UniProtKB/Swiss-Prot annotation:
Signal peptide: none annotated. ATP binds at residues 10-11, 18, 89-91, 99, 124-130. This is Phosphopantetheine adenylyltransferase. Reversibly transfers an adenylyl group from ATP to 4'-phosphopantetheine, yielding dephospho-CoA (dPCoA) and pyrophosphate. The record marks 18 as: Transition state stabilizer. GO terms for biological process: coenzyme A biosynthetic process. GO terms for cellular component: cytoplasm. Belongs to the bacterial CoaD family.
Length: 159
């Protein structure tokens, strides 16, 4: 039986924490779609195409991971791709509150859509794309938090 899961997010940019979760999800499910939200209302630093390209580059070794951009409701995207599992990361209690609301809304829109929550590895539990961008803007060392191609792209954006 093929189990298709979706790991959605903005991934602006994709971090080592995201990579940790998608790697672990790829070991749990037959096929994982890393679904990158357009999220234009969030005013991302990277365009959707740039985020998709970076994610494809860093997930290339994961043969059962596909990277796609999307702009529709997650429930619609899941239906279109015949997936019934959403993978989400929970870094803290504050993440849980938001994720709980999302999971319930997605289940309302698509009753067979289940949310599976993964706790990040401890060394990545404090990382977020926003925090990494803030560190980079102030000249801090971001190399421990991002895959090398992403570090290069982020530093180029800020140059």
């Amino acid at each position: 039986m093929i189990t298709k899961a979706i790991y959605p997010g903005t991934f602006d940019p994709i971090t080592n924490g995201h990579l940790d979760l998608v790697t672990r999800a790829s070991a749990m499910f037959s096929h994982v779609i890393l679904a990158i939200a357009d999220s234009s209302s969030k005013k991302p630093m990277f365009t959707l195409d740039e985020r998709v390209a970076l994610a494809k580059k860093v997930t290339a070794p994961l043969k059962n991971v596909e990277v796609l951009g999307f702009s529709e409701l997650m429930a619609e995207f899941a239906k279109k791709h015949n997936a019934n599992i959403l993978v989400r990361g929970l870094r803290s209690v504050s993440d849980f509150e938001y994720e709980w609301q999302l999971a319930n809304m997605n289940r309302h829109l698509m009753p067979k859509l289940e949310s599976v929550f993964l706790i990040p590895s401890e060394k990545w539990s404090f990382i977020s794309s926003s925090l990494v961008k803030e560190v980079a803007r102030h000249g801090g060392d971001i190399t421990p938090f991002l895959p090398k191609p992403v570090t290069k792209a982020l530093l180029a954006k800020l140059a």
